[in-house]
């Protein structure tokens, strides 16, 4: 599934029944034993055959595109990375058949560093496949190539032929372990860099793809869902593929990454069906990406996207960050006022007092500063102070100009994330009429419960005391 609505869609289905440059690669690659992977399923959607796989350090989404413009794409939640092959236009439509489902593998690059990926076999009824472009990088660049046909020069990768194989591989631009995709022809032949069909008009390939980005830690189904969750296998599988201890993803293949609004809405909708560990993973991901002002990050840029973004724009906000640290976008304002209601619902309605206190005391490691951490309670309190500060002008002077506007210089700032979404307006109704009142009410509830007392000075408590 390819849109950011995937997780919210899964929430509805679950709750309905619940009652709510690599110079070369080493030849040796380790294929996981024949035991079934922890998660493996397929979804055919329109012209796309999608095969999802997760097993230990491997998480990958293989997409085979049918039609006159075939392509192969593998997306990895690790680093929101991916590899893709786009082929020249065909005279007629051609269809892929996945003849062997993806198997997880761990391999080594030429410097002995691990890459995590998959191997699968497929056939396609086409007389010839000529590779138009290979893109190996962060998925944002794969999306760019898909939509506008351009990528940065820094990530261009040459094609290499070796017998019956076509190989594309490279290190990341900072020299870290990178990406690879290899096509071995199993039926037909290679000719001048193109794959020519056999006498029966079919092409057969073995595909290997891998990424060197740091693996994420998947949440098992037992850690993710409780007994109230619907017995909907498709929804469970999709949710599991998108759920990790480090964060929840918005959707695959295009959005295997964090979005603040998507995370908070999904956690709240799914809360009746989620295990505490899953709720805490979602809220924790938001806290880990909060800025010093208490604002919630809308989106993150990862791995090679972050590296190239910094090379182009520099660390305008902080030049002490690592070159490959995530870049965080704080342009949206609606998610700032979603955190308090979601956190209050969990801490006051679903978790026991002991669970709530334990969660708030847990250290949350910063997503951008390796080794930096603060208690979850301190981070949540920071957001509540931001909410109250932003709401104070309207409390003191109840007129239109005291409402909370979208940020200066922007045409977007909430879920209607398009330049015409607010009709060129500055004051979003949902933010001011629904989200801010909900955030203030949640602040008052949390303050009254005393859960945040260890994380507030007397002055800060006084700041928040008039919230509700």
Protein language model regions, located:
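Aromatic-rich carbohydrate-recognition surfaces in CAZymes
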Residues: 256-396, 433
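Acidic/His metal-coordination segments adjacent to aromatic residues that form catalytic metal sites
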Residues: 240-249, 305-330, 408-428
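Secondary-shell segments that build the walls of catalytic and ion/ligand-binding clefts
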Residues: 376-422
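Terminal accessory carbohydrate-recognition/targeting modules of carbohydrate-active enzymes
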Residues: 2-22, 28-235, 243-247, 251-257, ...
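C-terminal/domain-terminus segments
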Residues: 226-230, 235, 355-365, 454-463
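Catalytic cores of carbohydrate-active enzymes
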Residues: 297-299, 388, 398-401, 418-419, ...
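An acidic intrinsically disordered interaction segment
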Residues: 218-239, 295-304, 392-409
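Eukaryote-specific, cytoplasm-facing alpha-helical/coiled-coil scaffolding segments in long proteins
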Residues: 293, 362-373, 411-416, 460-467
């Amino acid at each position: 599934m390819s849109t950011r609505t995937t997780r919210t869609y899964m929430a509805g289905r679950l709750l309905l029944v619940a009652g709510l440059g690599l110079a070369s690669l080493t030849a040796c690659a380790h294929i996981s034993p024949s035991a079934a992977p922890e998660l493996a399923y397929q979804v055919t959607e329109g012209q796309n055959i999608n095969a999802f796989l997760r097993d230990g350090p491997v998480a990958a989404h293989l997409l085979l595109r049918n039609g006159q413009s075939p392509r192969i794409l593998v997306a990895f939640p690790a680093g929101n990375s991916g590899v893709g092959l786009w082929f020249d236009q065909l005279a007629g439509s051609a269809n892929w058949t996945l003849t062997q489902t993806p198997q997880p593998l761990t391999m080594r690059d030429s410097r002995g560093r691990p890459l995590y990926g998959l191997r699968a076999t497929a056939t396609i009824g086409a007389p010839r496949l000529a590779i138009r472009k290979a893109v190996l990088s962060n998925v944002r660049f794969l999306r760019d190539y898909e939509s506008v046909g351009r990528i940065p020069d820094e990530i261009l990768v040459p094609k290499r032929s070796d017998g019956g194989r076509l190989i594309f591989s490279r290190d990341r631009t900072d020299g870290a372990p990178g990406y690879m995709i290899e096509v071995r022809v199993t039926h037909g032949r290679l000719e001048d860099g193109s794959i020519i069909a056999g006498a029966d008009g079919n092409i057969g390939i073995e595909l290997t793809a891998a990424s060197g980005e740091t693996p994420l830690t998947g949440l098992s189904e037992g850690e993710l869902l409780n007994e109230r969750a619907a017995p909907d296998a498709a929804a469970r599988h999709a949710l599991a593929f998108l759920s990790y201890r480090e964060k929840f993803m918005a959707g695959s293949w295009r959005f295997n990454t964090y979005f603040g609004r998507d995370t908070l809405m999904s956690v709240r909708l799914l809360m009746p069906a989620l295990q505490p560990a899953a709720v805490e993973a979602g809220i924790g991901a938001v806290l880990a990406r909060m800025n010093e002002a208490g604002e919630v990050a809308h989106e993150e840029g990862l791995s090679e996207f972050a590296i190239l973004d910094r090379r182009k724009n520099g660390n305008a906000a902080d030049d002490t960050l690592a070159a490959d640290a995530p870049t965080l976008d704080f342009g949206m304002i609606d998610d700032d006022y979603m955190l308090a209601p979601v956190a209050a619902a969990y801490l006051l309605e679903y978790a026991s007092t002991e669970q709530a206190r334990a969660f708030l005391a847990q250290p949350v490691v910063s997503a951008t500063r390796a080794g930096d951490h603060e208690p979850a309670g301190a981070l949540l309190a920071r957001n509540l102070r931001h909410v109250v500060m932003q709401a104070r002008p309207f409390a003191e002077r109840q007129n239109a100009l005291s409402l909370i506007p979208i940020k200066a210089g922007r045409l977007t700032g909430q879920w209607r994330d398009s330049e015409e979404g607010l009709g060129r307006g500055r004051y979003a109704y949902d933010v001011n009429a629904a989200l801010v009142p909900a955030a203030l009410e949640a602040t008052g509830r949390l303050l009254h419960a005393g859960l945040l007392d260890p994380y507030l000075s007397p002055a800060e408590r006084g700041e928040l005391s008039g919230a509700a």
